[in-house]
Each structure stands twice: as structure tokens, then as C-alpha cells.
Design a protein with these regions (language model features):
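Short catalytic micro-motifs in class I SAM-dependent methyltransferases
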Residues: 118-119
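Short N-terminal helix/helix-N-cap motif within the alpha/beta-hydrolase-1
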Residues: 78, 123-128, 153
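Conserved class I S-adenosyl-L-methionine
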Residues: 1-44, 58-62, 82, 142-181
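A conserved beta-strand element that flanks and buttresses the S-adenosyl-L-methionine
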Residues: 115
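Short alpha-helix
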Residues: 184
Length: 184
């Protein structure tokens, strides 16, 4: 089962990934994400948001600062631990729990918005997951999914240079490359 491999990998990566997220929260990227999300968010002063695959709490912190209530779920306990620490350090609160996004423990039509960043490629059954997400989304709510092609550096020389520079920086800072998984 793919989820077992994914879970094992990200349990081990939680601390390093959290450091990257903390840096990202201080960058222009965070402001760009916030603007993009709020552009597509339902027009409500206080949104109930579900962050699927929340990792170390990027959206919980960003949207929490805007006055929205964010519930974050992740399949890995270590990511939830990092998210709790990061949200607390930011002086915010969020509901954070370990949960498989294919089987959500929420009533129908719970959330105004569901956001998901960079997990679709890890799902065992994307159709089942999307169906489940839509079940807990309120009528008129928004589902925002962002994923990436992580292997452009294999096909594009310019992307390869960027990837190699970032990988070298990771080696210098952490003593290892971008990904520590043997298949990456």
C-alpha cells in the first residue's frame, strides 16, 4: 500500500520539512499563497477550513492570522506534532489531528473551504479521497487543490540548474539532499 511508504517517509522528514515551512512563512511565497487562497475563498468573515495533508501547519498559521478557523489533518503523527508546535509558537490555535484523508471523521457539510497542497500524488485512491472531501464541504464551499510536477528537472536544463543549486544548499545546511528517500 502506497500510504504505508508515504507515511513512513514523511514521519522521518517532519522535522526538516517543518524548518522549510517556517522559512517559507517568512517569505513572499506565503503572502502569495494567502492572496491566492483568499481570492477563491467563499465570502465569509470567519471560514471553517480543512487543510488536508497539513504537514507542519503552513496554512493553519497563515489563515489563522487572518481570523479563520483551520482544522488540519495529516497521516503522520510527527507532522501533526510539528504543526502543533508551530501553531502554538505563532500564538494561534487550530484543530490538528492524525487522519487518513480517504476516510474523514467529520459530519457532512462541515467546512466552508478545503485546501490541499502537494499530496494528490501520494494518494492510494484519489477518486475516493476527492469524494470524501466533497462530502464534508458545505454547499457553495470551495475545494482548492494545488500539486506539482516534482520531476521537471529531469526534462528541462534550466530547471535542472535550479534543482541542483537547491539540492546543494540542502547538503550544506542538513548534510543531505532534497529527498532522503532511496527512490527519490
Amino acid at each position: 500500500m502506497q500510504n504505508d511508504k508515504i507515511k513512513e517517509y514523511w514521519e522521518g522528514e517532519a522535522g526538516i520539512y517543518s524548518e522549510g515551512i517556517k522559512a517559507e512563512l517568512k517569505s513572499e511565497t506565503a503572502e502569495n499563497w494567502k492572496n491566492l487562497i483568499l481570492e477563491y475563498a467563499p465570502e465569509k468573515e470567519h471560514l471553517e477550513v480543512l487543510d488536508v495533508g497539513c504537514g507542519p501547519g503552513f496554512f493553519e498559521i497563515m489563515l489563522g492570522k487572518e481570523g479563520h478557523h483551520v482544522t488540519g489533518i495529516d497521516i503522520t503523527e510527527n507532522m501533526i506534532h510539528e504543526a502543533k508546535e508551530n501553531v502554538k509558537a505563532a500564538g494561534l490555535s487550530a484543530d490538528l489531528m492524525t487522519m487518513d484523508c480517504h476516510n474523514l471523521n467529520f459530519p457532512d457539510e462541515t467546512f466552508d473551504m478545503i485546501i490541499c497542497r502537494n499530496i494528490t500524488w501520494t494518494l492510494d485512491d484519489p477518486q475516493k479521497a476527492y469524494k470524501e472531501w466533497l462530502r464534508v464541504l458545505k454547499k457553495g464551499g470551495r475545494l482548492l487543490v494545488s500539486d506539482a510536477c516534482w520531476y521537471l528537472h529531469l526534462y528541462d536544463e534550466e530547471k535542472k540548474k535550479i534543482y541542483e543549486a537547491h539540492d546543494a544548499a540542502m547538503w550544506e545546511k542538513y548534510g543531505r539532499g532534497i529527498h532522503a528517500h532511496e527512490d527519490a
